């Protein structure tokens, strides 16, 4: 999918009349290229904390770029730190325990559950996520995450469905329609499912309950200042349809921009075409970086 996605973005940018130079490695920034702005889609480089590589290189080379500053990218991708920020801002999130590589692995005592979720603390699309039922299994999975080069985050399994809110924030926080994945509330969604490697029963639909939408938007407005300014993002929550409980899961500051993913489909529902979406995000990013000036702040 990513090859199709990246090609679609390139075609849209070129159709705007932009002179696009294509590269597939951060090494292009080892020597300063002759460009005015970097539109990076290399958000995962296959190693820990790779999401900070492109903004760091652009900062080093004094090149304006899409996304958010390196420190904000690092904060947003550290699930534990974002959950700490959520708690500080009064946004509900599940209890959790962080196990950094090289630190002692001692059993947590401040929460318990029938099932635990163990995940890499800085991964995407549920990569490396597993289920455990007791401390012995939890400890084994922590060791596996560490062996793979990740810090490990442990949480109770949360029954419910995923709800996702696409947000742009270069000049001010602007929210697209809230989307949800209807799926079995007791099943853990997998990396293979989210990446399209296996069939999924999860169905992406628009959320239409105005009170629920207002609640999710309110939580997001509370937490967004912790990672602002950012050009675009996707905020993820878990909603239990039975208990009505909502918990913040994570935020992706430079989420998948493909037209067939959440942000593209939400924009279409809002009456914004895919080219208009990319142009809006790009204009906001360029204004944030001082490349252009916009007449109207909307």
Feature map (PLM): residue ranges:
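Active-site nucleotide/adenylate-binding loops and adjacent lid/helix of ATP-dependent enzymes
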Residues: 20, 30-31, 73-160, 214-217
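Phosphate-binding site of ATP-dependent enzymes
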Residues: 133-218, 241, 245-247
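Active-site "cap" helix and flanking loop/linker of ATP-utilizing ligase/carboxylase catalytic domains
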Residues: 180-233, 265-298
């Amino acid at each position: 999918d990513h090859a199709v996605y990246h090609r679609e973005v390139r075609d849209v940018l070129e159709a705007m009349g932009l002179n696009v130079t294509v590269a597939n490695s951060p090494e292009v920034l080892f020597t300063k290229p002759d460009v005015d702005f970097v539109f990076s889609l290399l958000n995962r480089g296959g190693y820990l904390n790779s999401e900070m590589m492109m903004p760091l290189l652009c900062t080093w080379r004094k090149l304006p770029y899409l996304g958010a500053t390196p420190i904000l990218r690092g904060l947003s991708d550290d699930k534990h730190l974002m959950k700490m920020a959520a708690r500080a801002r009064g946004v509900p999130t599940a209890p959790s325990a962080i196990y950094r590589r090289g630190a002692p692995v001692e059993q947590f005592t401040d929460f318990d559950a029938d099932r635990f979720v163990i995940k890499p603390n800085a991964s995407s699309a549920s990569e490396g996520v597993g289920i455990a039922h007791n401390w012995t299994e939890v400890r084994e999975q922590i060791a596996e995450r560490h062996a793979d080069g990740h810090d490990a985050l442990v949480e109770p399994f949360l029954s419910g469905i995923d709800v996702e809110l696409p947000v742009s924030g270069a000049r001010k926080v602007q929210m697209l329609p809230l989307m949800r994945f209807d799926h079995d509330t007791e099943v853990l969604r997998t990396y293979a499912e989210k990446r399209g490697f296996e069939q999924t029963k999860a169905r992406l639909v628009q959320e239409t309950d105005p009170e629920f939408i207002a609640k999710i938007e309110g939580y997001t407005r509370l937490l967004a200042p912790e990672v602002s300014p950012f050009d675009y993002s996707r905020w993820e929550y878990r909603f239990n349809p039975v208990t009505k409980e909502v918990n913040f899961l994570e935020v992706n500051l430079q989420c998948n921009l493909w037209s067939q993913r959440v942000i593209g489909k939400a924009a279409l529902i809002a009456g914004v075409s895919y080219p208009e979406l990319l142009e809006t995000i790009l204009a906001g990013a360029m204004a944030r970086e001082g490349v252009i000036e916009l007449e109207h702040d909307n």
